[in-house]
Swiss-Prot record:
Gene for this chain: xerC
Source taxon at top rank: Bacteria
Species the sequence originates in: Haemophilus influenzae (strain 86-028NP)
CDD domains: INT_XerDC_C
Annotated catalytic residues: 145, 169, 237, 240, 263, 272 (o-(3'-phospho-dna)-tyrosine intermediate)
Protein name per the record: Tyrosine recombinase XerC
GO-annotated cellular components: cytoplasm
Record has Hydrolase as a keyword: no
PANTHER family the record matches: PHAGE INTEGRASE-RELATED, TYROSINE RECOMBINASE XERC
Taxonomic placement: Bacteria, Pseudomonadati, Pseudomonadota, Gammaproteobacteria, Pasteurellales
GO biological process assignments: cell division; chromosome segregation; DNA transposition
GO molecular function per UniProt: DNA binding; tyrosine-based site-specific recombinase activity
Main location group: cytoplasm
Length: 295
């Protein structure tokens, strides 16, 4: 089983050119799947039937996986089994036609303008704070994914024209603009970056000089949010969602927001129209004479 998996990782990395982050996610899901199969004395992919796939989902749910994680596990397994079909090792994909449990619809959380101002109201001159502020300003200004920001190099950024070149999902490149506040924050960071003794061309580096990790960015954002007095947990997703929501509120141009976010499907971007509508509905309920609730 592991031999086939190793060939699959090579296929994803070399032929599909998937990001290391995406491959790691798939590895985690398929490693967990193999453990479940081993408990059932299944040691060959040819032994996997539709019933076995359903058992994997049931066992995963029993282990505490939520709907979104179950869908990810099924997707990872289905893609791998499709690869085995293409390679002629399986005749059919046993995961075809099997659906993960329905996911509940959750609106992404975002911050309002006042919270953004509160978040960024910090003019600390400590080099690590200058770096973190540049990360925050760029993530909010451009709506970058965590993996996109973490993968930026020095030559990815142009503060003169205020554009950043990012590699998104599926190894797709796009150019995204950023604002003057982000530009200033990045220029301030570049002045002190050498103090970290950088070992490569990564735009953002750790105190050891290496490219800053996904986990380190998450932890630094969480710490920054607490220090700035935010009532809710700060994470990269929240900054991206806030960017998308505020752009849509200001422009109503769904296609433009789709391009900026790097969404391949417009349906992915459309969730922000629901978020925007919810905000408008709340304003309506509070303001309209015929909508005000009785106290």
């Amino acid at each position: 089983m592991l031999t086939a998996l190793n060939r699959y990782w090579d296929y994803l990395r070399i032929e599909r050119q998937m990001s290391p982050h995406t491959i790691t996610n798939y590895q985690h899901q398929l490693d967990a799947t193999i453990k479940i199969l081993a408990q059932q004395d299944i040691h060959s992919w040819t032994q996997v039937t539709p019933s076995v796939v359903r058992f994997i989902l049931a066992e995963s749910k029993k282990q505490g996986l939520k709907e979104k994680s179950l869908a990810l596990r099924l997707s990872a397994l289905r893609r791998f089994l499709s690869f085995l079909v293409q390679q002629g090792e399986l005749k059919v994909n046993p995961a075809t036609g099997i659906s993960a449990p329905k996911q509940g619809w959750h609106l992404p959380k975002n911050m309002d303008g006042e919270q953004i101002q509160q978040l960024l109201a910090n003019d600390s001159k400590e080099p690590i704070d200058i770096r973190d502020r540049a990360i925050l300003e760029l993530m909010y200004s451009s709506g970058l994914r965590l993996s996109e920001l973490q993968g930026l190099d020095l030559n990815s950024i142009n503060t003169r024209v205020r554009e950043v070149r990012v590699i998104g999902k599926g190894n797709k490149e796009r150019v995204v603009p950023f604002g003057r506040y982000a530009s200033h924050a990045i220029q301030e960071w570049l002045k002190v970056r050498a103090l970290f003794n950088p070992k490569d061309e990564a735009l953002f580096v750790s105190q050891l000089g290496n490219r800053i990790s996904h986990r380190a960015i998450q932890k630094r954002l969480e710490t920054w949010g607490i220090r700035q007095g935010l009532n809710s947990h700060l994470n990269p997703h929240k900054l991206r969602h806030s960017f998308a929501t505020h752009m849509l509120e200001a422009s109503s141009d769904l296609r433009a927001v789709q391009e900026l976010l790097g969404h391949s499907n417009l349906s992915t971007t459309q969730i922000y129209t629901h978020l925007n509508f919810q905000h408008l509905a709340e304003v309506y309920d509070q303001a309209h004479p015929r909508a005000k609730r009785k106290k």
